[in-house]
A protein has these predicted regions:
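Membrane-embedded alpha-helical bundles that constitute the cytochrome b-like, heme-associated redox core
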Residues: 1-122
């Protein structure tokens, strides 16, 4: 049986809201970047570096990265609990799902740490 222990919020409605809000954050970030690319008169490395050197842009990027990871975790958790279970995968389905969730979690943590290193590293 699938438990809610590894769910993001223990509640399907809350997970749904988190995914919707995170998608709005990602969409706003993409629209801003697209507008910047389209309307920047000189899109050079210096201009791009200056944009991402601003603290507000670093924070916006970090918030978007965290929103993306929350969105991804909920989606991957849903895929794992729907398809990687005993009924669909046989007697090892629950173990496979556990491994899958650990790998997904480790990858998302690595992506966040890597993003922080890129944003504020030397």
């Amino acid at each position: 049986m699938v438990t809610q222990v590894t769910s993001f919020s223990k509640n399907g409605v809350s997970d749904w809201y988190i995914q919707r809000m995170s998608s709005y954050v990602m969409a706003a970030y993409v629209v801003f970047l697209l507008g910047f690319v389209l309307f920047a008169s000189d899109l050079s490395f210096e201009v791009w570096s200056a944009l991402f050197g601003q603290t507000w842009m670093q924070l916006a990027t970090l918030v978007t990265l965290l929103a993306t990871c929350a969105h991804a975790w909920i989606g991957m958790w849903t895929v794992g609990t729907d398809y990687l279970r005993g009924r669909t995968m046989g007697p090892k389905g629950d173990q496979l799902r556990g491994i899958y969730q650990v790998v997904c979690g480790l990858l998302l943590v690595a992506y966040v740490l890597w993003g922080i290193k890129i944003l504020w590293g030397n």
